[in-house]
């Protein structure tokens, strides 16, 4: 018999299965428990050499982050409760009367914050994870696109020009000028890519020194005496 939920995305099925098996409240999901179940399930699937999609692995990371955030919030609540206990234990009436009213209001605010913590339903949890997944995928896609563009430019440049000619040309300019400010000398993206690898070659050969005081800051190519 085929499971009617088989067509549901694997990570969604795993979360729903975890809620059912651990007898969790679907209207107020315990993030820490579902994260632990999910990680354990992944370990079990890997034992059987089952190939897992990138989404399944990414969701594990998202759940772990959500678990750490939930535990941090719980610690903050417990810390506030400890302070409340100390305030109740010590009687400050003998010291000063006025702060008592402020302290009472502060306690009411803390109680209000604790009560205002909204429970997370299983549907809300799944929607939140889907949003996080889309963010990660979009970010990766943009990085891959930029990387591919640079690789294509480098390939085109290598096909068009012999890299040794570019190195010789750069060295000739460097011998005339002594110091080259990379971003000022090479204005276009194509030129910056074209001369970057030759700059590394010259530095590796001990003919030039590359200086960059700040990350992504001004790059200076300085001629070395040889």
From Swiss-Prot:
Pfam families: SMC_ScpA. Residues 121-163 form a coiled coil. The keyword Nucleotidyltransferase does not apply. It comes from the Archaea. The keyword Coiled coil applies. InterPro entries: ScpA (IPR003768), ScpA-like_C (IPR023093). Keywords: Coiled coil. Gene3D superfamilies: 6.10.250.2410, Structural maintenance of chromosome 1. Chain E. This is Uncharacterized protein MJ1134. The lineage of its organism: Archaea, Methanobacteriati, Methanobacteriota, Methanomada group, Methanococci.
